[in-house]
């Protein structure tokens, strides 16, 4: 289990100066050719998403104005707060910020031939489904994960096991992404 606080994470500026990335975790850890990766990005200007051939991307708007996503004849989609949207990461996708507002997004990418991610918003206590990896990010409220208290802009990532996240207040929201491995693949094969 790895815990993080977004406010204390290192920031990588994009080469085109249109945004920045805070990498939460990758699997396998510290590998350039990852099977899955979770990050938080801040987008300050209109532009194109980076291409990642063979990957699926799920983007969830956390803060800021809505973002319009366009991929030639494939799709036109307005990204709204806390509504995950998935697309092939090898498509050219243009992002246009509405009203010029900066946006902050949660991104998870998975290798299409190895694993699949699901992203949900939780508003009550729950137990993960025993996946072989996952990430949680607290949007608001106070949540208990094992012996650790997580509050706004904090989270955790893990590579195996079931975990219970307990909401400690009457209301709260967290983003939860679970990684499931496709038949014939296992995280044990790559470590």
Curated annotation (Swiss-Prot):
CDD domains: cupin_HutD_N. Coiled coil: none annotated. InterPro entries: RmlC-like_jellyroll, RmlC_Cupin_sf, Uncharacterised_HutD/Ves, Uncharacterised_Ves. SUPFAM superfamilies: RmlC-like cupins. It comes from the Bacteria. Pfam families: HutD. HAMAP family: Ves. Belongs to the Ves family. This is Protein Ves. It comes from Escherichia coli O1:K1 / APEC. The lineage of its organism: Bacteria, Pseudomonadati, Pseudomonadota, Gammaproteobacteria, Enterobacterales.
